From Swiss-Prot:
Keywords: Cytoplasm, Elongation factor, GTP-binding, Nucleotide-binding, Protein biosynthesis. Belongs to the TRAFAC class translation factor GTPase superfamily. Classic translation factor GTPase family. EF-G/EF-2 subfamily. Gene3D superfamilies: 3.30.230.10, 3.30.70.240, Elongation Factor G (Translational Gtpase), domain 3, P-loop containing nucleotide triphosphate hydrolases, Translation factors. Transmembrane segments: none annotated. It holds the Pfam family GTP_EFTU_D2. GO terms for molecular function: GTP binding; GTPase activity; translation elongation factor activity. This is Elongation factor G 1. It is found in: Cytoplasm. Catalyzes the GTP-dependent ribosomal translocation step during translation elongation. During this step, the ribosome changes from the pre-translocational (PRE) to the post-translocational (POST) state as the newly formed A-site-bound peptidyl-tRNA and P-site-bound deacylated tRNA move to the P and E sites, respectively. Catalyzes the coordinated movement of the two tRNA molecules, the mRNA and conformational changes in the ribosome. Residues 7-282 form the tr-type G domain. One of its GO terms (biological process) is ribosome disassembly. The keyword NADP does not apply. GTP binds at residues 16-23, 80-84, 134-137. The gene is fusA1.
Length: 691
């Protein structure tokens, strides 16, 4: 049995490269749907969706913000995501729980580095999407070029649904190709009134050709449309829309619309497209849920449809510190949840109680008593929940796959300025750790300094700013440092036995393990095969946990060990003799010695860059990148500028924006994202005693 309201629900995200106009689009959506009585502007610092002080001051989105609105009797749960690579976890966790997405492109800049990154993230979760080519009013706007870039860079087929009425400064509206009409947006009421008119005679042939391309795309998903198309019979717009929707749901095509959010043009047709083409939770694929680790590990995952009558299964995808308490954002995939319910956090194996439930409107709340499958809410009272945890009923334990957490690449040493700051710092950092799984904290064993690790300089800058503003903690900061990775160059096998008296008891255990390189980008894999005398299940889990923790702490340098496969060849268990402490001590020391024998080496992060610079400065910029051990991957001429694609070690890119602005006289821009790890140079290996 399903809830009839689910067909009138959409869970969507707004994703794109930074500055493509995501939040500007979101603000118009709230205004035209009646959820907001004014249009907030990013450049004025009063956007509803950018509610953090840092967002308002910097004019960028830092945290994914959830709200809801209504259009054509359909409720839309909307998440506006950041575009900056330092906050990519916000996109990752949003796409993990959303049913669909709207991808925003700039008509001037086109497909940019972070656009490709968020597109790949959407591909990984098979998220259906539609697209808006925004900023059609800007000088240099070229929607045809953007379409061509989409065709070249993405496997999903773009289908142009609009043609522009005017270009650049004369952009006045759009031609709805499928319906055969012009749409303009009144300037007297900030675009709230949409006016229709006939297509000018001189554009008729252009529109007919564009409509033919739409019908061709639809015919791939409807044989009857294909037959009518080949026979030259008329095809109604409703049939075409239904076929296009099927293509969208399979992620094989994406309708593309035109607009200018800042000029209040093109948002209402985009909202119509959300309803017409994107799925309800009922049309989303069933979610795979497995028994928790302490249950039957051999059982096949259950495929749970979106059913309010099914077993409760929800994912905690975001945690905020709200006045010292946890506010946990949930996507409910199956079953229902009420305020006051006692539930199980199956990821951590602990009981939780839901005190209250809220529907979020940015940072404002609307209290609700119950939430059903398919919906997104926030809960208060979940004391243990962290990002990626599964919530279910104790009598029906289930476990969802967690989130893919990118590894941080930049670290920063901090010291409290005053004695009272030293006392407040640990609690403040703990609350920030709740919120952000890409943020890490450790203490330097030699200096005693607190080391913050994050996705980039901006990420850590925001963290330290929040320490001051939200928690009243002042810190001194050092220079940002690269977070390297350890790996091994060869294979090695080692047998280690631990036998020692500790506090009056003999602790004993032995392990034979092998470590081997697994290939760049493969991460860490620990293999613990079954044998004739297997360890008890609890000891197996503790052994794996111990090895994971040892690898995270590093072997020689304190940097995590990665791109290796560790196989437990033998771990004998003798009842009454083998102890947990002895077994784990043997494993820890055995791993250290095996990794050392296998030849430890350091890897450094390499970043993919996309730079836009004036043509006259391109040669100088390329030369400076090559001096930084960079590699040029591509060069594309765009009117009076050059688009440079390159890769360079992160260690060479700190403060690069200032250098680029100096070289280009303030006219150059760049974006970067993590690409891969390469062996660190010899001087770094020597510094850490590995050469």
């Amino acid at each position: 049995m399903t809830c009839p309201d689910l067909k009138n629900l959409r869970n969507i995200g707004i994703i794109s490269h930074i500055d493509a106009g995501k939040t500007t689009v979101s603000e118009r959506v709230l205004f035209y749907t009646g959820e907001s009585h004014r249009i907030g502007e990013v450049h004025d610092g009063n956007a509803v969706m950018d509610w953090m002080e840092q967002e308002q001051e910097r004019g960028i989105t830092i945290t994914a913000t959830t709200t809801c609105c209504h259009w054509r009797d359909v409720r839309i749960n909307l998440i506006d995501t950041p575009g900056h690579i330092d906050f990519t976890i916000e996109v990752e966790r949003s796409l993990r729980v959303l049913d669909s997405a709207v991808v925003i492109f700039s008509a001037v800049e086109g497909v940019q580095a972070q656009t490709e990154s968020v597109w790949r993230q959407a591909d990984r979760y098979a998220v259906p999407r539609i697209c808006l080519i925004n900023k059609m009013d800007r000088i240099g706007a070229d929607y045809r070029r953007v379409l061509e870039q989409m065709r070249k860079r993405f496997t999903t087929r773009p289908v142009l649904m609009h043609l522009p009425l005017g270009i650049e400064g004369d952009f006045a509206g759009v031609i709805d190709v499928l319906e055969g009409r012009c749409l303009t947006f009144s300037e007297t009421d900030q675009g709230a009134t949409v006016e229709t008119c006939d297509i000018p005679e001189e554009r008729q042939s252009e529109v007919a050709a564009a409509r033919e391309q739409i019908v061709e795309a639809a015919a791939d998903f409807d044989d009857a449309i294909l037959a009518d198309f080949l026979e030259g019979r008329p095809i109604k717009a409703a049939r075409t829309r239904a076929a296009l929707r099927r293509g969208v749901l399979t992620c094989r095509l994406c309708p593309v619309f035109l607009g200018s959010a800042l000029r209040n043009k093109g948002i209402q047709p985009l909202l119509d497209a959300v309803i017409d083409y994107l799925p309800s939770p009922l049309q989303a694929p069933p979610i795979a849920a497995s028994p928790p680790n302490h249950q039957d590990a051999t059982a096949e995952p259950a495929l749970l449809p979106c059913d309010p009558q099914g077993p409760l299964c929800a994912l905690a995808f975001k945690v905020l510190s709200d006045a010292g308490r946890k506010l946990t954002y949930l996507r409910v995939y199956s079953g229902s949840l009420r305020a006051g319910d006692e539930i199980l956090n199956s990821t951590q194996g602990v009981a939780e109680k839901v005190a209250r439930l809220f529907r979020m409107h940015a940072h404002k709340r609307e209290r609700v008593t119950e939430v059903q499958a398919g919906d997104i809410v926030a809960a208060v009272g979940l004391k243990h929940a962290l990002t990626g945890d599964t919530l279910c009923r104790a009598e029906q334990p289930l476990r969802l796959e967690g989130l893919r957490i990118p590894e941080p690449v930049v670290s920063l040493a901090v010291e409290p300025r005053h004695i009272d700051d030293r006392e407040k710092l640990p609690a403040a950092l703990e609350k920030l750790l709740w919120e952000d799984p890409t943020f890490r904290v450790r203490e330097d064993a030699d200096t005693g300094q607190t080391i913050l690790t994050g996705m980039g300089q901006l990420h850590l800058e925001i963290i330290t700013d929040r320490l001051h503003r939200e928690f009243g903690v002042e810190v001194r900061t050092g220079r940002p440092q690269v977070v390297y990775r350890e790996t091994v160059q060869n294979s090695a096998r080692h047998h280690e036995r631990f036998h020692r008296e500790t506090e009056g008891r003999i602790q004993s255990g032995e392990v034979t393990l092998e470590i081997a390189p697994s290939g760049r980008g493969k991460g860490l894999r620990i293999v613990l095969p079954e044998d004739e005398n297997p360890l008890p299940a609890r000891l197996r889990e503790e052994l794996k946990k111990c090895l994971h923790q040892s690898c995270a702490a590093g072997i020689r340098t304190g940097y995590p060990l990665t791109d290796v496969e560790i196989t437990i060849i033998e771990a004998p268990f003798e009842p009454g003799l083998t102890t947990e402490i002895g077994l784990l001590a043997a494993a820890q020391r055995g791993l250290s010695l095996a990794a050392t024998q296998a030849g430890l080496t350091l890897l450094e992060p390499v970043m993919a860059l996309e730079l836009t610079v004036p043509t006259e400065h391109a040669g100088q910029v390329i030369g400076s990148l090559q001096q930084k051990h960079g590699r040029i991957d591509g060069l594309e001429t765009r009117s009076e500028s050059e688009l440079i694609q390159a890769r360079a070690p992160l260690s060479q890119l700190f403060d690069y924006m200032g250098e680029l602005r100096s070289v280009t006289r303030g006219r150059g821009t760049f974006a970067m994202e993590f690409s891969h790890y390469d062996p660190a140079p010899d001087e770094i290996q020597t510094l850490y005693g590995l050469l």
